[in-house]
Amino acid sequence: MLSFQHTKILPYKPKKLFDLVWDIKSYPQFLPWCAAARIISENNQEVISELVIQLKGLSEKYNSRVINTITDNGIYLIDTVAISGPFEYLKSTWQFIPHSTGTELKFFINFKMTSVILDKLIGSYFTIATEKMILAFEKRAKEVIK
């Protein structure tokens, strides 16, 4: 299983960053490996989404259940679990924690592919791809959050 975690202080309000990550349909506009994104069903706290990922000549589609939570102390959470596709297991969590200078962003992801070959291929790019994803979200925040 591959794992990654990232923590950073960003100069934006938690709700603004939460809204950015919750806007799954916009991912193809700024995530380098996301070729398509579609919402299958949604309500205020849960989305079933379909993403098409292209990386190093491979294209894979998967569905996820994405759930948001706002805690009593103002922490915004987005939890994602893959429900179909090439993952034996995928879980990620975004936490947006109020901070004196904006938001403490915490991101966690761990996953395992169903194919050993895919697992090895993705594994060799996993850290780089995840870091690029975080940077893409940060760049998007600079562009769209006022």
From Swiss-Prot:
Tell me which SUPFAM superfamilies the record gives. Answer: Bet v1-like (SSF55961)
A Pfam short name:
Polyketide_cyc
Superkingdom, natural source: Bacteria
Sorted alphabetically, the keyword list is: Toxin-antitoxin system
Q: Name one GO biological process term.
A: cellular respiration
Alphabetized InterPro entries for the sequence = COQ10-like, COQ10_START, START-like_dom_sf
GO molecular-function term, one example from the UniProt record: ubiquinone binding
Q: Which residues cross the membrane?
A: none
Give the protein's function.
Toxic component of a type II toxin-antitoxin (TA) system. Binds to 50S ribosomal subunits, preventing them from associating with 30S subunits to form 70S ribosomes. Its antitoxin is unknown.
**Hey, which family's this protein in?**
Belongs to the ribosome association toxin RatA family.
Protein name stated in the entry: Ribosome association toxin RatA
Species whose genome carries this gene: Rickettsia prowazekii (strain Madrid E)
Which taxonomic lineage does the organism of this UniProt entry have?
A: Bacteria, Pseudomonadati, Pseudomonadota, Alphaproteobacteria, Rickettsiales
